[in-house]
Each structure stands twice: as structure tokens, then as C-alpha cells.
Regions:
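CheY-like receiver
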Residues: 112-117, 124-152
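Conserved phosphotransfer microenvironments
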Residues: 53-71
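Alpha4 helix (beta4-alpha4-beta5 surface) of REC/receiver domains from two-component response regulators
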Residues: 64, 86-104, 108, 115
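Conserved acidic segment of CheY-like receiver
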Residues: 2-13, 18, 22, 52
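Conserved phosphotransfer cores of two-component systems
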Residues: 45-47, 70-78, 98
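Hydrophobic/aromatic residues positioned on beta-strands within the core alpha/beta folds
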Residues: 82-83
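Acidic, metal-coordinating helix/loop segments flanking the phosphotransfer/catalytic sites
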Residues: 33-51, 59
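A generic structural motif
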Residues: 26-31
Length: 152
């Protein structure tokens, strides 16, 4: 059984890059992509992803408060991982207000994304074949720059 990921980002280039990164990971399947909070709510409700991988800065962010988005998505996903190019205090607070378990820097996703899912999404398990592959891999063993966000 694979981990179902819904990828939410306003940039086509970033969505494509992350999709390619996850495509190479055993046991993880990108089941959809969203480019706005409106799409995120609809797709999370319909697809019920295990992991919601989202940028907290979206084109329609003025129309959707974090409280509204959080109330609609938390019922249908097990774990939220926020990603952003900005890792300042305001973005960390924003990610936390959406219910994110962690905020990752987009510049470090190659090394940090899979380890972060394993660390911060304990109810989601990556198959053992992936774990053994990771142990033999030359990639870094774990996240190096992410910070855990305490859920409200």
C-alpha cells in the first residue's frame, strides 16, 4: 500500500520538480495537485490523501483564512508538511496555523522531504523496501534544516 500525497503549490515548475522527486520514491504516490486553497479543499475532501504537501502562500490566500482551510482539510488527511522558499517567523506561524507538522525549505527538499514525512507523520508508514533503499543510499540520513512546528 502506498502513501498518498496531495501536492499543493502555485508554481507549475515547483509542482513538476516535487512530483519527479516523489516519483522516484518507492511507496509514495502523488494522487493529485492543487494550485489554490479552493482546489486544495476540494481535492483533500475527494481524495483523502495521507500527506498534504503544501505551500502556505497561495494565489487565493486573501480569500481563505488558515482557520477555514484547516477546518476543511484536517478531517481528510493524516499529516501536513508545509514547504516554502521563505522560512521566516511569519511563514512558520502561517504554516502552523494551517496545522502543518513541519515547514521545509524548498531549496532542501531533495535531502529533507522523505525523512521529514517519516519523522513528522508517524501515522503514515513508508514500506520497508524504501527504508532499506534509504540505508544504502548516499543521500543524507535525515532532515538538516527543518524545524518542527508545534500544532496549535
Amino acid at each position: 500500500m502506498s502513501i498518498k500525497v496531495l501536492l499543493v503549490d502555485g508554481s507549475h515548475v515547483m509542482r513538476s520538480a516535487i512530483r519527479q522527486l516523489l516519483k522516484n520514491e518507492l511507496g509514495i504516490e502523488v494522487i493529485g495537485t492543487a494550485t489554490s486553497f479552493a482546489e486544495t479543499i476540494a481535492l483533500t475532501t475527494a481524495l483523502k490523501p495521507d500527506v498534504l504537501l503544501m505551500d502556505p502562500h497561495m494565489p487565493d490566500e486573501r480569500e481563505y483564512t488558515p482557520k477555514l482551510v484547516k477546518s476543511q482539510i484536517l478531517l481528510h488527511t493524516k499529516c501536513i508538511v508545509a514547504i516554502s522558499l521563505w522560512n521566516d517567523d511569519d511563514t512558520k506561524t502561517l504554516a502552523q496555523s494551517f496545522g502543518a507538522h513541519v515547514l521545509l525549505d524548498k531549496m532542501n527538499l531533495y535531502a529533507e522531504l522523505i525523512p521529514a514525512i517519516k519523522q513528522f507523520c508517524p501515522s503514515v508508514s513508508i514500506p520497508k523496501t524504501t527504508d532499506s533503499f534509504r540505508n544504502d543510499s548516499k543521500r543524507p540520513a535525515g532532515p538538516s534544516t527543518e524545524e518542527r512546528l508545534d500544532a496549535p
